[in-house]
Amino acid sequence: MAKKVAVIGAGVSGLISLKCCVDEGLEPTCFERTEDIGGVWRFKENVEDGRASIYQSVVTNTSKEMSCFSDFPMPEDFPNFLHNSKLLEYFRIFAKKFDLLKYIQFQTTVLSVRKCPDFSSSGQWKVVTQSNSKEQSAVFDAVMVCSGHHILPHIPLKSFPGIERFKGQYFHSRQYKHPDGFEGKRILVIGMGNSGSDIAVELSKNAAQVFISTRHGTWVLSRISEDGYPWDSVFHTRFRSMLRRVLPRTAVKWMIEQQMNRWFNHENYGLEPQNKYFMKEPVLNDDVPSRLLCGAIKVKSTVKELTETSAIFEDGTVEENIDVIIFATGYSFSFPFLEDSLVKVENNMVSLYKYIFPAHLEKSTLACIGLIQPLGSIFPTAELQARWVTRVFKGLCSLPSERTMMMDIIKRNEKRIELFGESQSQTLQTNYVDYLDELALEIGAKPDFCSLLFKDPKLAVRLYFGPCNSYQYRLVGPGQWEGARSAIFTQKQRILKPLKTRALKDSSNFSVSFLLKILGLLAVVVAFFCQLQWS
C-alpha cells in the first residue's frame, strides 16, 4: 500500500515535491492556504497575512536554463530571465503536464502537525487543517514542509532611534507593489539586497531623490556575463566551483573581486563590501551603476538616527526632507503549525541535517524543502531535496545516526560562518554546485566523470566545463531521463532563441576579423625580428 504524504504549500517546493512523490509511487496530498499555485511568484495587488508578497516588476535572478526542473526544460522562446508572470506560466505548464493539480486542496490552512501516539514505531503524523471554517484531521505516513521563508517581514525598528517621531511614511519592502504614488518624493531605502536595489532603481525613475543605506556594502553583478550569456551559466560550472573550493581563500577572494569589478569599480561607487573575505551573495541588478552615475540614487552608510523629517548617518552626513522610508531588511521565518521541539527556529536559524531533516526524530518522516538560500537557483535545489526525501520516505535511502547528523549540522554551520559570515540574511546560505552534487550522490544521480571520459568524453567535458544545470542529474540513477543528454547539448540553442528575433544575413565578418588578427600577429612578429636585425 502506498505511503500517504502531506505536502504543505503549493509554491515551487510544493509542486516539485508533489511530482517527486508521484514518481516514487507515494500518495501525496497538498494543502495550499490560497486559491492558486505559485507561492511567492504569484503577484497580487494586495498584501495578505501568511503569504509571501512580491512587487509587480520582479524578474528572476537566475536564468531559465539554470532554473528549470531537470526533466522539463522551459520553452525555448521564453526569455532567459523571466518576469514573475512568465515564471508562473511555466509552473502552470509543469503542473498540467504532470497532472499535479488533482493532489492539491486549495484554500486549506494547516493548523497543526503532531506526532501520532505510536510515532516511535509508525513514524506517522496527525495533520489538522481548516477549510471554509471547518476543521478536519487525517493521518499521514510522512510530511513535507514547503511553506517558504519569505513571509514574516523583519523590521528591526530598535536599531533606528527616532523612528517613532518620524513624520513621513515607513513600511517594509514586502508592502511595496509599484512606483505609483511615489513621484516627486525623497525616499530612503534601508538595505541593499536584491529587493532593496530593485525598488530603489524603480523609484528613482520618477522620485525627486532616492537614497539607499547599506551597512556593509555589496557586490553588484549584471545578469549579462561573458559574450552576453546569462551570468549563472558562466559562473556555475564544476570547474569554477572546484577552483573556488581548492584554492586558498585569499586567491578566491582576489578572483571574486576581479570578477565583480570587471563591470565597474565598486570602491569608486561607494559599494565595495566592508569584509570582502566573505562570499556574500551579490546583488543582481543591471541598472544600479547607471542610476548612481545619473545621481538618481545616492549610496549612504548606516542610519544612526532619525528625526521628524531627516536621516542622520554614521558618517555624520544628514539628508533632510525625507518623505518615505522603505525597510528592505529581509525576513524571518517560523512554522506555527509545528511544535518548537520538531523544528526550532533560533536567531533565524534551524538545525536540520543537510538543511532538510530534523536529526532527533525517531523516524525520518518529516522534511523541510526549500528552506535554503543557495548561491544559485532554488528550483533545481528544491527538486534534488525532494527527490532524496521521497526515497528516504520510501525506504530506498537511509540516514546516518543522530550523532552523525548532529556533527554534520555543527560542522556545516561552522563552515557557513567561515564562508558567508553571521549576518541574519546569510543563515541559509550554501555553495550551489557542491550542495547539488552532495544531494545527487545520496540518490545515485551524480554523473561519474571518470567513466564518462571513456564512454562519452564529449559529454564529460561539457559537464565539467559547461553550465551545471539540473539536466545533469537525470543522466544516471533513479529517475533517469532519456532526454537529458540532448537537453545539455541544446541549451545554447534555447538561450539564444529568444534573442534572435531579427533575421540577419550570413556575414563573413567573423572570418575577416579572424584574418585581421592573424595578420596583426604576423606584423608584430616581423617588426620584432626587424628590430633584432637592426640592433
Swiss-Prot record:
Pfam families: FMO-like. This is Dimethylaniline monooxygenase [N-oxide-forming] 2. The modification N-acetylalanine is found at A2. The chain crosses the membrane at residues 510-530. It is found in: Microsome membrane; Endoplasmic reticulum membrane. The keyword Thylakoid does not apply. It is an enzyme of class 1 (oxidoreductase). One of its GO terms (cellular component) is endoplasmic reticulum membrane. FAD binds at G9, A10, G11, V12, S13, E32, V40, W41, N61, T62. It is a single-pass membrane protein. Its cofactor is FAD; Mg(2+). Belongs to the FMO family. PANTHER family: DIMETHYLANILINE MONOOXYGENASE. Its EC number is 1.14.13.-. NADP(+) binds at T60, N61, S195, G196, S197, D198. Keywords: Acetylation, Endoplasmic reticulum, FAD, Flavoprotein, Isopeptide bond, Magnesium, Membrane, Microsome, Monooxygenase, NADP, Oxidoreductase, Transmembrane, Transmembrane helix, Ubl conjugation. There is a cross-link at K492 (Glycyl lysine isopeptide (Lys-Gly) (interchain with G-Cter in SUMO)). Signal peptide: none annotated. SUPFAM superfamilies: FAD/NAD(P)-binding domain. Catalyzes the oxidative metabolism of numerous xenobiotics, including mainly therapeutic drugs and insecticides that contain a soft nucleophile, most commonly nitrogen and sulfur and participates to their bioactivation. GO terms for molecular function: flavin adenine dinucleotide binding; N,N-dimethylaniline monooxygenase activity; NADP binding.
